[in-house]
């Protein structure tokens, strides 16, 4: 072997040792559906909880009956029928109890109309106040001086907070109101045909018809709305692949009724959780879910995770670890307090969405609640859990009922070892005379009849005459109506 030949060295032993690491593989949740999207980016309050796998299910895994009754449809409303007619047709096709929509569209207007079914109708109010986007075709009454640049400038001018009065033919009172135009963009313009097409993103309740009239006034030629289409309502738009027609809904229900195929029905209907993706989230332990459904406040021990940037007084959505929406709530703490506090109220329920008893009851099973049950069973507390003369002093000192204010709290019973000699030697005052119950009732009755007793005979006769005339007039009116 020549000296220039490379000599392989034995590698150090340490290079083959796998060292222990205090890390774990990260899960990419950016593609998870609904409320579970970016779950790994939420801040962790605690990771310890008792899962209840036999109750509840992921929104996309519900049985078909629950799926339909907790669903929403992003419907492409056809021209001519009113929004109420369309919603009534959906109700009849799907054979459900309740339906509602996210905001009325005029009969001639087409586009996104979010139809909520049964449980999802609880979200209708929130969706009616969500932002909207429209594409509008405007017809000018004459050639626009300045052409396309003038039209684009007028659109830019009519951006921001605007005064609007509803059109002459409208379902609301014609009061002056302020509505905000967030953005607008010119799409097409034909000055020879006196037509223009523009896109607008605006606040709920904005009248595009009124906006077209204002554009005509600003350009000095007059204008009116020719056609209108809503392209986005809240979080749902015509580009996200969820837009369906009435024929699609009818076909999906027919397939399920005749062939038992629910695939098309699941494609047409979306879970209600899709409407809540813009809310900040609070993840609730499975054991606390049913208490929240019964109206309880969410407390710190029931919180698992929370989104960044939550502020006090903000609307948030309470969700389970499976991605189900429990309720819309008002946050009582900000994100900083949620990270540092060890007790307190996290959120108060504003609108409950989930049905009661979908998850089992888990309240009243802690050490304090168990002790309270024992005391009630042995007669040391009354049937409502309030202290009585037999209540031990240790319980009175340690237990605080947060549902009762300090002014309403019952007086604590005197300890058993209290000595009569400890009382001051002042002479006992005579007890005030107690009124009999029957005497109080008779006094109330006499007060109510005081007016009749004080009146003279002439006043009494006049009162009776007026009463008789009123009665005869009423009977005559009734008989005329029957004829």
From Swiss-Prot:
Gene3D superfamilies: Pseudouridine synthase, PUA domain. The keyword Transmembrane helix does not apply. Keywords: Cell cycle, Cell division, DNA-binding, Isomerase, Microtubule, Mitosis, Nucleus, Repeat, Ribonucleoprotein, Ribosome biogenesis, RNA-binding, rRNA processing. SMART domains: DKCLD, PUA. Residues 463-476 have a biased composition (Basic residues). GO terms for biological process: box H/ACA sno(s)RNA 3'-end processing; cell division; mRNA pseudouridine synthesis; rRNA pseudouridine synthesis; snRNA pseudouridine synthesis. Its main location: nucleus. It is an enzyme of class 5 (isomerase). Its EC number is 5.4.99.-. The keyword Transcription does not apply. It catalyses: uridine in 5S rRNA = pseudouridine in 5S rRNA; uridine in snRNA = pseudouridine in snRNA; a uridine in mRNA = a pseudouridine in mRNA. Residues 432-462 have a biased composition (Basic and acidic residues). Residues 409-428 have a biased composition (Low complexity). GO terms for cellular component: box H/ACA snoRNP complex; microtubule. One of its GO terms (molecular function) is RNA binding. Pfam families: DKCLD (PF08068), PUA (PF01472), TruB_C_2 (PF16198), TruB_N (PF01509). Residues 279-354 form the PUA domain. Coiled coil: none annotated. Residues 406-483 are annotated as: Disordered. It is found in: Nucleus, Nucleolus. Belongs to the pseudouridine synthase TruB family. Catalytic subunit of H/ACA small nucleolar ribonucleoprotein (H/ACA snoRNP) complex, which catalyzes pseudouridylation of rRNA. This involves the isomerization of uridine such that the ribose is subsequently attached to C5, instead of the normal N1. Pseudouridine ('psi') residues may serve to stabilize the conformation of rRNAs and play a central role in ribosomal RNA processing. The H/ACA snoRNP complex also mediates pseudouridylation of other types of RNAs. Catalyzes pseudouridylation at position 93 in U2 snRNA. Component of the small nucleolar ribonucleoprotein particles containing H/ACA-type snoRNAs (H/ACA snoRNPs). This is H/ACA ribonucleoprotein complex subunit CBF5. It comes from Chaetomium thermophilum (strain DSM 1495 / CBS 144.50 / IMI 039719) (Thermochaetoides thermophila).
């Amino acid at each position: 072997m020549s000296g220039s030949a490379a000599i392989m060295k034995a590698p150090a032993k340490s290079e083959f040792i796998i060292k222990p690491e205090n890390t774990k593989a990260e899960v990419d949740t950016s593609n998870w559906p609904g409320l579970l999207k970016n779950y790994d980016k939420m801040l962790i309050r605690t990771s310890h909880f008792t899962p209840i796998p036999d109750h509840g299910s992921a929104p996309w895994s519900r049985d078909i009956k629950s799926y339909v009754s907790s669903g929403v449809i992003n419907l492409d409303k056809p021209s001519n029928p009113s929004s109420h007619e369309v919603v009534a047709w959906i109700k009849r096709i799907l054979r459900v109890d309740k339906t509602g929509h996210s905001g009325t569209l005029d009969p001639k207007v087409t586009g996104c109309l979010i139809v909520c079914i049964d449980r999802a109708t609880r979200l209708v109010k929130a969706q009616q106040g969500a932002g909207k986007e429209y594409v509008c075709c405007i017809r000018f009454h004459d050639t626009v001086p300045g052409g396309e640049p003038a039209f684009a400038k007028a659109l830019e001018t009519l951006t921001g907070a605007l005064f609007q009065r509803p059109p002459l033919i409208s379902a609301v009172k014609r009061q002056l109101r302020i509505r905000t135009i967030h953005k607008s963009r010119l799409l097409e313009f034909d000055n020879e045909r006196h037509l223009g097409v523009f896109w607008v993103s605006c606040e709920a309740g904005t009248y595009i018809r009124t906006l077209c009239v204002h554009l005509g006034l600003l350009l000095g030629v007059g204008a009116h709305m020719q056609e209108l289409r809503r392209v986005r309502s809240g979080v749902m738009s015509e580009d996200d692949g969820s837009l369906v027609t009435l024929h699609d809904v009818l076909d999906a229900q027919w397939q399920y009724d005749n062939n038992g195929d629910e695939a098309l029905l699941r494609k047409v209907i979306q879970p209600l959780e899709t409407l809540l993706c813009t809310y900040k989230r609070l993840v609730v332990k499975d054991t606390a879910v049913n208490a929240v459904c019964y109206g309880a406040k969410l407390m710190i021990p029931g919180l698992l995770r929370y989104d960044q940037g939550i502020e006090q007084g903000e609307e948030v959505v309470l969700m389970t670890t499976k991605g189900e929406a429990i309720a819309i709530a008002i946050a009582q703490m900000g994100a900083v307090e949620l990270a540092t506090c060890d007790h307190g109220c996290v959120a108060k329920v504003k609108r409950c969405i989930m049905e009661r008893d979908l998850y089992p009851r888990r309240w009243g099973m802690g050490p304090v609640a168990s002790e309270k049950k024992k005391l009630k069973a042995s007669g040391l507390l009354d049937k409502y859990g309030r202290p009585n003369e037999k209540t031990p002093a240790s319980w009175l000192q340690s237990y605080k009922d947060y549902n009762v204010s300090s002014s309403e709290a019952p007086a604590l019973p005197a300890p058993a070892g209290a000595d009569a000699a400890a009382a001051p030697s002042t002479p006992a005052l005579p007890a005030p005379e107690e009124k009999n119950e029957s005497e109080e009732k008779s006094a109330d009755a006499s007060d109510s009849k005081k007016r009749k007793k004080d009146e003279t005979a002439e006043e009494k006769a006049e009162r009776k005459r007026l009463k008789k005339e009123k009665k005869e007039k009423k009977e005559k009116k009734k008989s005329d109506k029957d004829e």
